[in-house]
Amino acid sequence: TPSLENGSYDVSNVDDVVSDILKYGWDKDLSNKSLVIGCTTNPGDCDFFQDRLSETGINVFYNPEFIAQGSIIKDLQNADMVLLGGDGKHKGNLVNIYKKIQYGYKEPSIHLMSTKAAEITKIAVNCFLTTKISYANMIGQVLAQSNLYDEIETVLSSIGSDSRIGHKYMNFGFGFGGPCFPR
């Protein structure tokens, strides 16, 4: 999801889809339909879209992806968790779909909550990961400034060996980036 100048998420593409549904969908029975939003949104955006679609009977759900550029398919097939935010009557159907496809090779944990709680959870996960990347780079810089270049990997691996911390994202080098992590 691209950012606006103020740092918030640009959800104009989703807004365009909602506008198209309102423009072209009135002659159809949409009461058994759901709109599942997968991009990162600002807390409250999904509620706003649900309000706009309230007269159509469409249920809005929030199901953000946890993917990285360069490993999108692998990340989707091996998801650790699925967030599903929404209060609509079709939530159970969506959960059953996820259980059937299981995203690939392992069954992710599925977390059901309101759309706003899911929006906040997605942002919180992204913030935690960027903090972890920054922390690993800070430790690497301290070691480099102490002329301990050859021990950076050993130190970060040792820190990551603590199960409360883990090895993922405990690497010295490039910082975070891409469309999801600059905020």
Residue ranges and their predicted role:
Residues T1-R183:
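Structural/interface elements that position substrates and couple domains in central-metabolism enzymes
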